[in-house]
Amino acid sequence: MQHFMPASLIAILALAVPAHAQSGGAGHDSAYVRVFDNCTSYQAEDEPVHFSDCAGYGDWTVHIVAGEHGAAVAYSQRGKVTQWGQNPPRAAVFQDLGQVMEWRLDASGAPFATIYRSIFTGYERGDGGQYLTVAALRPDGEVGACHVAYIEAAQQPNANQIARDAADYLAPGWQCGIEEPIVFDLDSEMDVLTIAAQRRPGH
């Protein structure tokens, strides 16, 4: 596994033609793109930090800032710094991004959320963990996207489905800049659908 070191950043970026997958809640579908092949990358002056602007799904742009120990993701050109301030729980010192990003599509085929994997490793065997980050996309908002949920993915066998449920049932109505992301792990008292039901008007 490669870490986000300056010499290795571009080597791990890969993006392919999207592949459509199974439907989810409310007639939603998924498109998968490999992270991140079609990118423009540059390094900050006097700092071991790299920035990459990558072609996402449709007309979306995915932005990455990556340093020696971690990385952050933002979407489109609006509010990148705000988005970079949101990150999943840090399970260990080093963070890699998974090679594939899932884009959740509405009935018209427009993306409204993404799911990507963060892989954490440490200095010792057994250190680390994985989280799936669910981000709500806001094409007309002041900030292009915001985080909705973090799903612990190393111990939960149904983590991918939990992430899709969070994207489908929480992301569309999520209040970016107001609501804090929810962590779903083995200790969570409520699942996504229960929280979604409580968020409906009148509840």
Where are these regions (language model features)?
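General secretory precursor processing signal
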Residues: 42, 57, 149-150, 179
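Short helix/strand-capping turn motifs
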Residues: 88-157
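Short alpha-helix boundary/capping motifs
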Residues: 16-18, 198-199
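Charge-rich, low-complexity N-terminal segments
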Residues: 3-4, 17-87
